[in-house]
Each structure stands twice: as C-alpha cells, then as structure tokens.
C-alpha cells in the first residue's frame, strides 16, 4: 500500500444521483452520526422521522446484518409499524433511558459495541462535547448513529425547545409526512411517503425530495424518488420555520 493512501469511507447509497450527489462520498457515510428532526408537530411526536429512520436503517441491515439498538425515554415505538415497513424487528434491541444524559451515554456505548450495525437515540439536543464523543464511538467500529430529535413530553418548561447545535454530526435532516399515492390495485393507501430535507451535510450540499418507502424485496435501496423539491420550496420552508 502506498504511503498516504486512505481507504474510502463506506457509504449507504440511496440509488438516486440527485440524492447521492449531495454527499462528498456519493452516499450517506457510515462511521458517523446524523441528526433527524420533524417539522411542526412531528418535532414532538416523532412519527414521520422515526419511520424515515427505520426505512434508512433497513437498507443498512439488509447490507451489513447486525443488531439495531434504539434508545428512548418513551415506550411508544410501535413494533407492528416497523414490521409494516419491512424492518427486521428480530434484530431490534429497545432500551429505556431515564433522562437525556443516560440516553446519550447508552447511544455512545451501543455505537462502540461489536455486532451493532446501527444505533438510534431519541434525544432533545446533544451539546458539542456529547456530539464529539458520539463521533469517536462511530469511528471505533464504523457504526452508524442517529439522534432522533424529540421534545420531551410536550416541550421544555418555559416555552421553546432547546436549539440543536448540530455542529458535530455529519448531516441534519428534517422530515414531514407527504400524501401517499394510489396503490397498484387502487385499494387502500399506497406506500408511505415523506417530505425529506437535507438541511446540512459536511462537505456536501443541501437538498429536498419527496421519497416513498420501497417495499422489502423490491430492490436494494430503501426509498424510491417521487420528486425533487425545487430550491425555492426548501428555502421557503426554512424561512417559515425561522420567522413563523
């Protein structure tokens, strides 16, 4: 091996150039942690962001195998819903935490553990020190970490939720539900869809899309691109959150 050469960082590809091209390595890198938050009420309920994360991790476990650790302070992770998205629930390890500090500590431990493909923690806002510790844990074994931002039980006393630093994570996403299309047989609802905004990416660029869950066994990638959001749509949504 020549001196100075580096092994390329493994990535999780979305299978869509318009998405993968936002990342410097051509896909969402492993060996790092990412922030996912909701828009509007989803900031508290976390339903759409959790479904998006579940779908994302399904693509990773299909490729790597291994366990998935999910750390939360609430007992509202709905296992049948995970199965409906094709998530391998047999690989799921659920852990209840008492407070924010324990949540982040458990996430760090999970990311440092051999045999864990991915770890998710429902937390409000890790500070810079906690974020750096999470990154070191990811680098130790090439783990994939997600901090799913949720306000604790209706928000913090005194009003607005604490702002997210986001400075130590590789990327930050904002997720909202989107109307489903008709199913192939025109009966019931089609696969779930999400409005997905990549707000920040280290060394990359932001973007926005409507993505649909790809059914298990229908391809190597967990999502299907429905449409790409125009730049002005993403900018308008960001301005509305900032000044609304």
Swiss-Prot record:
<protein>
    <recommendedName>
        <fullName>Protein ImuA</fullName>
    </recommendedName>
</protein>
<dbReference type="InterPro" id="IPR017026">
    <property type="entry name" value="ImuA"/>
</dbReference>
<keyword id="KW-0234">DNA repair</keyword>
<keyword id="KW-0227">DNA damage</keyword>
<dbReference type="GO" id="GO:0006281">
    <property type="term" value="P:DNA repair"/>
</dbReference>
<dbReference type="InterPro" id="IPR027417">
    <property type="entry name" value="P-loop_NTPase"/>
</dbReference>
<comment type="function">
    <text>Along with DnaE2 and ImuB is required for the error-prone processing of DNA lesions.</text>
</comment>
């Amino acid at each position: 091996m020549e001196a100075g050469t580096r092994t390329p960082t493994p990535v999780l590809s979305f299978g869509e150039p318009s998405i993968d091209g936002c990342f410097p390595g051509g896909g969402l890198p492993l060996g790092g942690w990412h922030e996912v938050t909701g828009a509007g009420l989803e900031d508290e309920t976390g339903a759409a962001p959790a479904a998006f994360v579940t779908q994302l991790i399904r693509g990773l476990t299909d490729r790597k195998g291994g366990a998935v650790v999910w750390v939360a302070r609430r007992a509202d992770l709905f296992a049948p819903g995970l199965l409906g998205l094709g998530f391998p629930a047999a690989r799921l390890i659920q852990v209840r935490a008492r407070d924010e500090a324990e949540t982040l500590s458990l996430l760090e431990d999970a990311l440092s553990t051999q045999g864990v493909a991915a770890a998710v923690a429902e937390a409000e806002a890790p500070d810079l020190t906690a974020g750096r510790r999470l990154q070191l844990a990811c680098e130790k074994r090439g783990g994939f970490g997600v901090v799913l931002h949720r306000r604790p039980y209706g928000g913090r006393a005194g009003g607005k939720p604490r702002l997210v630093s986001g400075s130590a994570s590789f990327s930050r996403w904002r997720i909202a539900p989107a109307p489903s299309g008709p199913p192939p047989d025109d009966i019931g609802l089609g696969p779930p869809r999400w409005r997905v905004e990549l707000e920040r990416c280290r060394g990359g660029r932001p973007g926005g899309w409507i993505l649909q869950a790809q059914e298990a066994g229908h391809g190597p990638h967990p999502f299907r691109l429905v449409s790409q959001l125009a730049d002005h749509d993403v900018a308008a949504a960001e301005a509305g959150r900032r000044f609304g």
